[in-house]
């Protein structure tokens, strides 16, 4: 319950005006409901001759009479006058019209209370999705190394929907039902405290039985949602690896794997659904037991000579008692739904509560560009729950220099350059820009002066224009076209069906690898960064595409400080300095010719590529 109240505090309070409106209309609905039921007693007593008492009007300000007695007496008095003047049949019709009017107002109030809750429910779901999405964008890259993308998607879709259906869906019950219970219970006590005392003794037994069924629902729901995440992750991997699956004729294997995930989810979801489905029949049965017990006890009282209530009042009491059963059933339903939804809240909170080690200091300094040098000072780095990847790397890069980093796969090249824009933070040593530790700089400013061109060109399912202008505010068409021309991309863009307004497809699937890379370079050119990071930007291209991309890169690198990672040594021969990284350490450094003369690691790498 504490977790549930915390969810309400976080997401419901911004919509308190809707809560207030719902409370008002629910209260009105409950009062009208009770008021219409109260007309049953005089109908039975007066119309069917059960009550023979002659009533006389009592002035409203009569001393010594309680308000209750005055109201009851005068109501019977006016009812008697109607019967005498218009007859029993007409009076019955009048009371029936009164009931119809009261019911119309009651149902109208109920509809208004439900309609008012709709904007709150949809707003809460929107708020959760936005909050999760914003959190995802703020998390470091290391988070996504530990989490499967399909699982994250499942939390944003399935779990958030479950929160809407279970938690916010139960919220309406939790607003309406307490009002109904208070009104109905007050009427029950007012009508017969003896019968109500008996009812109160029986109710806890029912509550215990209902609670026992729902106790394990949260754990079962959490397990089922985890299985659903595995299914979504499997689907995401299948869509992303479709080419490999077909190349290795692995359709059968993937089908079996997906079938297994789906069956596991089915079994888990079945257990949850069966337990949840037991809510209504169990509450129905227990409610009937309660009615029978009260009917027996009330009948016993009436048959006794000293009964505190008469038969019509007892019938009214039973009507109210039966009416109180439905709110209790709704509470029982909520007791199953809420734990199920809280399991989804727990999974969503795993994202929202994820720690972000990449933080910005309160007094972080702005940075407008690189004026002097970048310095890696005895840098050490280790991934979480892993061994150290970089061991005491020291490197100075002067403004305008091009530094190449080469080495075997797994030597730490990409990790080293990922430390500069603070995708990760060093675990030892420091990295400075113009003498200032990058951890003391504003993160947005730091990343704003760095441009990236990676081995895998990441494009969005958007137009050429928007992909090139990505991250650059108020970019004009002239600026985008100029960047595309420098990147050797303008020609094939103009050959597309709608030019710069052509959509490139999911992850740029409508383009070749070389075209995607040139669009990526155009994006970096438009950003106009002081520092450029090239991470094996031409390693996956054919000879012709590599030539065009290399030309674009050379234009991009002019007047910029560049850190280039390369497997093909031919692309970095003209670098001002080449650093050879081996097992997390710089083992050699110098120009291309100097390193060949050393006859060391670099020479061996070069000789292997000459074969």
Model-derived regions: residue spans:
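Membrane-integrated ABC transporters
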Residues: 1-38, 47-99, 105, 112-117, ...
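Hydrophobic alpha-helical transmembrane segments of ABC transporter permease domains
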Residues: 13, 24, 109, 113, ...
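An intracellular "coupling" helix at the cytosolic face of ABC transporter transmembrane type-1 domains
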Residues: 13-17, 141-142, 158-167, 171, ...
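Transmembrane helices of ABC transporter permease
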Residues: 21-28, 172-223, 296-309, 326
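Juxtamembrane helix-loop junctions of ABC transporter transmembrane domains
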Residues: 33-41, 93-94, 98-149, 153, ...
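Short intracellular "coupling" helices and adjacent cytoplasmic loop segments at the cytosolic face
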Residues: 48-52, 122, 130-154, 158-160, ...
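Helix-loop-helix
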Residues: 187-201, 275, 279-346, 351-352
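ABC-type nucleotide-binding domain
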Residues: 360, 367-611
